[in-house]
Amino acid sequence: MIDGKKVLFSGMQATGNLTLGNYLGALKNWVSLSDEYECFYSVVDMHSITVRQDPAVLRKRARNLLTLYIAAGIDPKKNCIYYQSHVSGHAELSWILSCFTYMGELNRMTQFKDKAAKHADNINAGLFTYPVLMAADILLYQADVVPVGIDQMQHLELTRNIAERFNNIYGDVFTVPEAYIGKVGAKIMSLQDPSKKMSKSDENPNGSIYLMDDPDTIMRKCKRAVTDSEGCIQYRDEQPGIKNLIDIYSACTGKTPDETVQEFQGKGYGEFKPAVGEAVISVLKPLQDEFERLSKDKAYIDSIIKENAEKASYYSTKTLRKVQRKIGFPDRIR
């Protein structure tokens, strides 16, 4: 708890370009959470280097992502928006927690198996211990809640196990986090393969709408979205492509899927797909305009980076010093 508010932690990797799915499924919902929670939103650039990165590209993407947080409406005065790499406590606590994590637990992590298969030429220790760093990210700020998707639930369970194990030995040091259960964001699927989630790492760029795509690109991708030969707009699992487009249109317009189906009753895909494109363009234009404005204000973004790193460091240091004292590290001489 900070100032009577529960603490919420979340973050995104500075790899690839954020998609419409990232925005509608997570980022858009983060904006309102500061009314209820003390929020820490990190650009988790340390996680990004488990895969080889071009240094200049990583640096640029990290800044763009932090700027996008603000452009999306996350107030940097109410929320702590920072680079993970600017707070050394993440790495320090990660090492300590790794000494309270069992190899068998990490071996069971399905994401490691998936990523190792994709990057067989670079199966590094960082990829294997990724969930421990994620646990440190969360426990460092004594987070009460963490918004997670199904693919990250296993990592949160590991975080809880590590926290409980540590607390059983040393007393109530860590808050044991819960999964955030609130408004469910739209789950947006690939435009080219609606059985897969829309992803910034999709090898087919036509499968994802990126937040910085121009209107012509957005419209082209929507018109080329994979559908079916039935020709009728119905919200059902048997038509995954159309169901996905209905979800996108509904999320962008604030309508329910049933209302969307009713609106386009009797109309074909040739009318529906451009309407989806227009809805997406309307949602993303204000975000794109604000991102462009903020990107030109280097001094402002720099000030946010500095102030928020200091705030994050303040709270992380409180936890880290407590942990260090509990496990027997010598006190610092000041």
Locations of regions flagged by a protein language model:
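Short connector loops/turns at beta-strand edges and beta->alpha or beta->beta junctions
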Residues: 45-46, 135-139, 194, 251-254
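Internal, conserved structured core segments that host functional sites
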Residues: 114-166, 170, 190
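N-terminal Rossmann-like or analogous alpha/beta NTP/dinucleotide-binding catalytic cores
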Residues: 2-136, 279-282, 292
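Conserved nucleotide- and phosphate/pyrophosphate-binding catalytic cores
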Residues: 22, 154, 160-334
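Short helix-capping/linker segments at secondary-structure and domain boundaries
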Residues: 38, 103-107, 140-147, 250-260, ...
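Short, histidine-centered active-site or binding-site loop motifs used for metal coordination
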Residues: 12-14, 45-47, 144-145, 202, ...
